[in-house]
Structure formats: C-alpha cells, structure tokens
C-alpha cells in the first residue's frame, strides 16, 4: 500500500500510537488531516500533545472536535467519580478506562470527514498486542468496521472505498517505539497517561505498558 500523495485522515490523540501513525504517514509523503476529540475526558494534556504533534509534522489541517461523552459517563476517563485502576494490566478483563463506543464514534466522524474532503485513508493507532483489552482495538472490530464503512458512504458504494489504515495493529509496544524513533516522532511531546498530572503517573495501564516497552527497547538497543 502506497501513501505517497494520498490524503489520509489520522485520528490523532497525542499519544504514542497515533503520533507514530502520523510520523509514518508523513515519511510516506501523504497529505495528513488530523482529528482530535475533546470528548469530556479527565484532562486536556493529550489534546495539547496532539496539537504539538500536528505542528511538528506540519500536517495539512488539524481539527479538535467537541463531543462530550461525559454526559453519560460510564468510564473512569469520563467520570471523575470512578477511580482509574493502578493495579496493573489484567488479562481477559476490560478495564473501566474503556469508554463505551468511543472508537466507533470517532471513526464514524473520521469517515464523514474523509468522505467530505475526498481522502483515501483513515489512519488509526490501534494495536491488539500490548493494550488494555478494549473491544474496539481488535482485528475483528477493524475488519467489521471496514465492511460497515464500505456500505455506509458514496465512495464505498461506487467501489472506491475509504480504507482503514492500521499499521500498528499487529505490533507490540516495543516495535511501535522503534517505529516512532525511525519516523521522527518526538516521544517526549506525546502523552499516554490517563491522569492529568504535571508528569505521567507511571501506575495506570497506559503508563505501565509504555514504560515496560521503552525499557525493553532501551535494553535491546544497548546490546547492539
């Protein structure tokens, strides 16, 4: 798949994964249109990081969409009455940081935007290996959403579908960190922590997964 001179809408959260997708697209000489969401999350640090990443890669356009999912809560990321888990990643259990329907809503908005500007791809930073078990970050979800997208818009019906591009889907976090360095991603400007403190907490699932992967990458890199 070639991205050169193609238009791509990237869901840019400001975290490691979406920033890496943006870096890959930039290195591939794609025309990048970034979308972030102010969805009633606990803090705005990730939006600040997304803006910094958008400027760093000098993308074509960057939009922040206001869409308040905190109106009904249901997750510790949108409801401050719920505690963010800090006990470590638990297998076979979806944590309360999962925001109901978030990716489905975000990708649907991206699909509308992509069709409006005649973009060829939607870039997503989802990955199914080192993650918290969210149902909307899995390969079967992406496959089914692609099928839905092909039916839901004009381009799909005309056999010129907008494709979901998920270059990180089958990678672990260590591999993603390597890709980030290879594609000029300023890791110190990205934000992955679920908390909105001045520094990452180091205890939430997102911090634990990222920090463990970085240590592995660092150790392997030092052995070379």
State the predicted function of each range:
Residues 167, 191, 209-213:
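Low-complexity, intrinsically disordered or weakly predicted helical/coil tracts enriched
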Residues 1-183:
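ATP-dependent adenylation/nucleotidyltransferase module used to activate substrates
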């Amino acid at each position: 798949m070639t991205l050169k001179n193609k238009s791509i809408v990237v869901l840019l959260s400001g975290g490691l994964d979406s920033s890496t997708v943006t870096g890959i697209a930039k290195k591939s000489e794609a025309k990048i249109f970034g979308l972030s969401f102010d969805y009633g999350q606990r803090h705005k640090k990730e939006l600040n990081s997304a803006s910094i990443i958008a400027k760093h890669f000098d993308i074509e356009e960057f939009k922040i969409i206001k869409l308040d999912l905190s109106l009904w809560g249901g997750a510790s990321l949108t409801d401050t009455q719920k505690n963010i888990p800090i006990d470590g990643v638990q297998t076979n259990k979806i944590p309360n940081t999962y925001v109901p329907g978030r990716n489905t809503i975000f990708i649907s908005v991206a699909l509308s935007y992509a069709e409006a500007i005649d973009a060829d791809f939607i870039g997503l930073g989802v990955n199914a290996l080192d993650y918290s078990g969210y149902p909307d970050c899995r390969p079967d979800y992406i496959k089914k959403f692609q099928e839905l997208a092909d039916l839901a818009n004009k381009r799909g019906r005309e056999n010129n579908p907008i494709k979901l591009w998920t270059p990180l889907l089958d990678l672990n976090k260590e591999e993603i960190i390597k890709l980030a360095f290879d594609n000029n991603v300023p890791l110190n400007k990205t934000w992955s922590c679920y908390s909105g403190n001045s520094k990452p907490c180091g205890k939430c699932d997102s911090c634990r997964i990222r920090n463990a992967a970085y240590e592995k990458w660092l150790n392997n890199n030092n052995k070379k």
